[in-house]
Amino acid sequence: MLVDVKRCAAVVAAAECGTMSAAAKKLGYTPSGIIRLVDSLEEELGFSVLVRKTTGVELTPEGRRMLPLFEQITAADEQVRQTAARIRGMSEGAIVIGVQSNVASY
């Protein structure tokens, strides 16, 4: 069984956001892409982790049990990325550039 980070992140985002569309926006996917990731994970696990409703999604009892593990997997992935960046001598984060409005128009 291969439980990859992208599929775990899709479930975590859907659970946090409450809809597949919001999860897709958060992760930079299309809603159908998120649905495919979740569906493939559920197929591999052999049970559903999300219930799809007209108003959004919610975790199944099995999904609630698995969510902490999915969160650990996604957190570990982020730690690996940050540590690798530090080893390479690069720090990750946002860069904010401020420009005065009269200069920005040129």
In which residue ranges do the predicted regions lie?
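The N-cap/first-turn positions of alpha helices
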Residues: 4-7, 31, 63
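A short LG(V/I)-centered, amphipathic sequence patch enriched
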Residues: 42-59
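Residues within the DNA-recognition helix of helix-turn-helix
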Residues: 30-33, 37-40
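N-terminal winged-helix
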Residues: 82, 88-106
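Helix-turn-helix DNA-binding elements, focusing on the entry/boundary residues of the two helices
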Residues: 19-20, 38, 52
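Short helix-boundary/capping micro-motifs
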Residues: 13-28
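Alpha-helical residues within the helix-turn-helix
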Residues: 25, 43, 64
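Alpha-helical linker/hinge and terminal dimerization helices associated
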Residues: 44-45, 66-88
